[in-house]
């Protein structure tokens, strides 16, 4: 049931973008990473539609400087508990520390683990995986991003 709802969501996303409202880069991003998003949804419960929308937004559809130099698809910063590879990038402030990965798959996996292991996101996992609006607004409420329109951006992308 969830897989069929997910596929419907993906077709809606693809149809929306195929209608010419988004760039070829967005279509390429979805095609390149949809299976990773589905796999992570099945593994952890993070909706594939949310993961793809975040990835599209955070990476400028795979073209941002940060993703090109670090495979960081979700803009996750280092913080004090990160022991992995790091890269420095200008974001809200100059020279901020971001997590760096060996592959997109590692970034997708870490994003899911980051959400699952962080108590401030725990309430999201009580939502139905098809409730992308609840997830989008919940991510903003929990402080995932500083952009005040973050949830609306995700919903619009989906």
Language model regions located:
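Sec-dependent N-terminal signal peptides
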Residues: 4-15
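Catalytic cores of secreted/periplasmic lytic hydrolases that degrade extracellular macromolecules
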Residues: 2, 18-158
């Amino acid at each position: 049931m969830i897989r069929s709802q997910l596929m419907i969501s993906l077709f809606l996303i693809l149809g929306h973008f195929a209608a010419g409202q988004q760039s070829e880069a967005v279509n390429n991003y979805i095609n390149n990473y949809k299976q990773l998003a589905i796999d992570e949804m099945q593994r952890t419960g993070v909706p594939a539609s949310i993961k793809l929308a975040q990835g599209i937004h955070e990476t400028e559809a795979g073209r941002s400087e940060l993703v090109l130099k670090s495979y960081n698809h979700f803009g996750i910063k280092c913080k004090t508990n990160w022991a992995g590879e790091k890269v420095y990038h200008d974001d809200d402030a100059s020279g901020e520390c971001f997590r760096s990965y060996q592959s997109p798959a590692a970034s997708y996996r870490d994003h899911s683990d980051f959400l699952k292991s962080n108590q401030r996101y725990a309430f999201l996992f009580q939502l139905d995986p098809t409730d992308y609006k609840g997830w989008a607004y919940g991510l903003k409420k929990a402080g995932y991003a500083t952009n005040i329109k973050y949830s609306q951006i995700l919903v619009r992308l989906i």
